[in-house]
């Protein structure tokens, strides 16, 4: 059960948040792990800025890391109260935050791709399904159902991977995957264990939680415990 904090004090800067620390949500006043929150600071123009990577200077406030919580915080004037000063707050602050989290996930995918842990192309992905080191299957959000069904059937038939959860990811468009992996026409891909893979999965988990407020069981195993 979450403890209820007694204040919404500003932090003393991004470096003051230790790994595993808890912070008070400025909206709900609940004490939660920092990994489940988004930090906000005041930018040079007096505007509320999402500090998704927790590196921006200045004192910050924390809000539960879901789209619904940030939208509610904007409506309830939480940022002005939390910072104890007038702060300009964009009406689309939740959308801005989501774009940053999505960008961080795609950046991690790019690093994994450069590290050789992302296989793309239908036939190569189909072959990769039998590997012991496969962690996830990635489908473009605009991929056709036929290819997804065939790969799902291949996965279902494979006894090697049946006993463990393979994360299914379909939140990025083909254009986004092309850009992240610097490859043309990426529709299906497989993520293998290796450099950058767990960081990518942690950021996918963070994006999933931000959008839905919940985590699927397979994704939750990779949820960030720090500022992934």
Regions found by a protein language model. Name each.
Residues 130, 155-164, 182:
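Arginine/glycine-rich "motif VI" loop of SF2 helicases in the C-terminal RecA-like domain
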Residues 1-85:
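N-terminal cysteine/histidine-rich coordination modules
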Residues 168-222:
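Helix-rich interaction surfaces within compact, conserved domain-sized segments
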Residues 68-147:
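Extended interfacial segments that mediate partner engagement and assembly in macromolecular machines
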Residues 152-158, 205-207:
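Short, solvent-exposed amphipathic alpha-helical segments in soluble enzyme
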Residues 32, 68-70, 142-145, 175-176, ...:
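Conserved nucleotide-binding/hydrolysis micro-motifs of P-loop NTPases
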Residues 1-22, 203-228:
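Basic Arg/Gly/Lys-rich low-complexity intrinsically disordered segments
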Residues 1-4, 11, 21-30, 46, ...:
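Catalytic cores of RNA-modifying enzymes
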């Amino acid at each position: 059960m979450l403890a209820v904090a007694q204040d919404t004090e500003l932090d003393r800067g991004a470096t003051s948040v230790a790994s595993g620390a808890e912070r008070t949500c400025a909206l709900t006043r609940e004490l939660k792990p920092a990994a489940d929150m988004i930090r906000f600071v005041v930018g040079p123009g007096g505007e509320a800025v999402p500090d998704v990577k927790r590196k921006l200077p200045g004192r910050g406030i924390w809000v539960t890391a879901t789209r619904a919580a940030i939208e509610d915080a904007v409506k309830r004037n939480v940022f002005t109260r939390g910072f104890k000063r007038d702060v300009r707050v964009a009406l689309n602050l939740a959308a801005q935050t989501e774009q940053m989290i999505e960008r961080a996930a795609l950046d991690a995918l790019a690093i994994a791709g450069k590290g050789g842990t992302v296989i793309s192309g239908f036939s190569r992905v189909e072959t990769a399904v039998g590997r012991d080191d496969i962690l996830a299957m990635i489908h473009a959000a605009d991929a056709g159902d036929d290819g997804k069904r065939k790969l799902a059937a291949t996965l279902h038939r494979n006894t090697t991977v049946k006993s463990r959860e393979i994360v299914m990811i379909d939140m990025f468009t083909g254009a986004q995957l092309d850009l992240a992996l610097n490859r043309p026409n990426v529709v299906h891909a497989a993520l293998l264990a290796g450099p950058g893979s767990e960081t990518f999965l942690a950021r996918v988990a963070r994006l999933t939680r931000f959008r839905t407020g919940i985590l699927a069981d397979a994704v939750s195993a990779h949820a960030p415990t720090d500022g992934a």
